[in-house]
Amino acid sequence: VEAAWQAGKITLSYFQSGVEVDAKADQSPVTIADREAEIKLRELIRLHYPNDGIEGEEFGREEGTSGYSWLLDPIDGTKSFVQGVPLYGVLLAREGAEGVDVGCVYLPALNEMVWAGRGEGCWWNGRRAKVSETEKIEDACICFTSWMNFAASQRDAVWQGITKKARLVRGWGDCYGHILVATGRADASFDPAMNPWDCGPLLP
């Protein structure tokens, strides 16, 4: 939680500042805020968990010896960040032999911190979080990142079937949509294209 908060402070110092945007090899955007935030996350993990591995979006993988590895996404939703939209987040999770046991998402521009641990429950800004009790898709609020991702992954027909039935469909995307689900403000969030550092922090 502390690491996510510190990395989030770095991102806020660049948010809505006209920060320069570079293109990675896959043409996805990256900024100095992404890089500096991941450097801070790695620094704090090495300080407190020196034997753990680290895998981050911007600087790749460092092997460890403890059997645990940290998954880092310094800015999930860089396109939103660059656009000045506050729905981006700092993501981190710890993964071991039995899967992810701790995950944290911090939304710096909204000052929302959500974390969960195996056997510890889920917490949202210091209070217990729980999912909604909606049972029928006809009553559900559905979130998504981009409808184009469904077409690109040949799941467009599935997506169309879901959205035609749902009560409300909104493009509150990236990690924000999933946090809305975790805190009971939305009922489901769909994203067919995710990396380990995108989905790992959401699993606990």
Q: How does the language model describe each region?
A:
Residues 11, 34, 45, 78, ...:
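Residue-level signal for inorganic ion chemistry
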Residues 1-75:
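N-terminal subdomain of lithium-sensitive/metallo-dependent phosphomonoesterases centered on the IMPase/IPPase/PAP
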Residues 130-204:
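An extended, acidic
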Residues 100, 128-130:
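Short, solvent-exposed loop/turn motifs
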Residues 64-123:
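DPxDG-like acidic metal-binding loop motif
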Residues 35, 39, 58, 74-77, ...:
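Generic detector of well-ordered alpha-helical packing
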